[in-house]
Amino acid sequence: GVQTCALPILLDAAQIYDVVSDFVTLRKRGVNYVGLCPFHDDKTPSFYVSPAKGLCKCFACGKGGNAVHFIMEHEQMSYPEALKYLAKKYGIEIKERELSSEEKIAQGERESLFIVNNFARDYFQNILKNHVDGRSIGMAYFRSRGFRDDIIEKFQLGYCTESHDALAQEALKKGYKKDYLVKTGLCYETDDHRLRDRFWGRVIFPVHTLSGKVVAFGGRVLAGATKGVKVKYVNSPESEIYHKSNELYGIYFAKQAIVKQDRCFLVEGYTDVISMHQSGIENVVASSGTALTSGQIRMIHRFTNNMTVLYDGDAAGIKASIRGIDMLLEEGMNVKVCLLPDGDDPDSFARKHNATEFQAFIQENETDFIRFKTNLLLEDAGKDPIKRAELIGNLVQSISIIPEAIVRDVYIKECAQLLHVEDKLLVSEVAKRREKQAEQQAERAERERRS
């Protein structure tokens, strides 16, 4: 608990613009600032910040309040946690009162999981730097990827030795509870009730929340060391603090660059993100090999409207991920696609090129998603009329889910040219699809109202 005597000083110091702009891109409008609401699926900016009143409010979903309320809602913190966050941000000291036992338990559970994760992160980092295996196996792997020391430090990379329970033993010795080691997924229990490390024999990539807390880990197996291990990457299981669909690898390190460049690059893996950072491109996040969820897209959308998806030169992955891109369009993002040269992924390409060369390559080679999809499917369909009809249906579907009418119109004209069909045809098809979508939405809303 936090004593209230420091509150006026704290609220006075916590400038609402300053606090909110850590998480939302704000643009000046008159005496206020406005941005996309971080609390609901906001297509047009409805989140207002008033520096004069020290308040923020979304005029669509109604959420808002002062700086403390904003942090509580945004970072999922309790009132005392939010006060501590702001006190730390502004360097104000606050005295604490004793918490009630219920408060302690509820706050304790989440906080304990984060504390255990922090311990594990420090432990893995220490092993990487100071343990003989860490240096000869873990560090050797990162060196082979060309990672510099400052980058290894920045992303808090680590190593877990091949002894199956070294982390578990160290944690228990330091007084961390077995229960929390299992709940965070750092360890699991064998049938004979022994604790095993989930990440033994792997290099470690911590996953950070938007505000920089370690919420999970990814571990990559090293070829020579663990023959017979089938799974290349192991990730933390879902937990009370980790919901995979709400986290994006690299977002904490990328958010400022995304705002500055007003664009986000999407790649697939941890090493893609890290290599691009090292080559000087920081506005990049990874979907970690799964399709993007609307929660992840919304997180990016707070910072920018523009997304470029970077693909390896092989075609197999592209067809699979095209479905995910439709979701980006639906959330109102401008999506471009850039194919890297054959045989390169973002990681290998970034190692061969500096930031200027990489950016120049993207500028010259990125295409609008709809144009990209049209050309890709046209190649597939060839002259076959049935396949071409299917292709038109497919593109019409992508265009019909775009929220802004002007953007839809531009795409319709472009597609009509590429496909040698009349605008009118596509206009009426898109209109039909949109009517159908509106009906389905109304039905869904009605069902929810009844239930």
Each language-model region and where it sits:
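A charged alpha-helical hairpin associated with nucleic-acid processing machineries
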Residues: T209-L210, K255-R263, A291-M307, D312-S451
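Short, conserved phosphate-binding/catalytic loop or strand-edge motifs used
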Residues: G54-L55, K88-I92, S100, M139-S144, ...
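Terminal peptide-recognition signature
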Residues: L7, C37, C58, I71, ...
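Structured, non-catalytic alpha/beta "coupling" segments that mediate domain-domain communication
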Residues: E73-G91, R202-L222, S348-K352, T356-A360, ...
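N-terminal structured subdomain of primase-like DNA metabolism proteins
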Residues: V2-K104, E162, Q417
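Conserved phosphate/pyrophosphate-binding and hydrolysis machinery centered on Walker-type P-loop NTPases
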Residues: L10-A13, R27-G30, E103-L113, H131-S136, ...
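Conserved active-site segments centered on acidic
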Residues: E81-G134
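Phosphate-handling DNA/RNA-contact segment within nucleic-acid enzymes
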Residues: R29, I105-A120, T161-F303, M307, ...
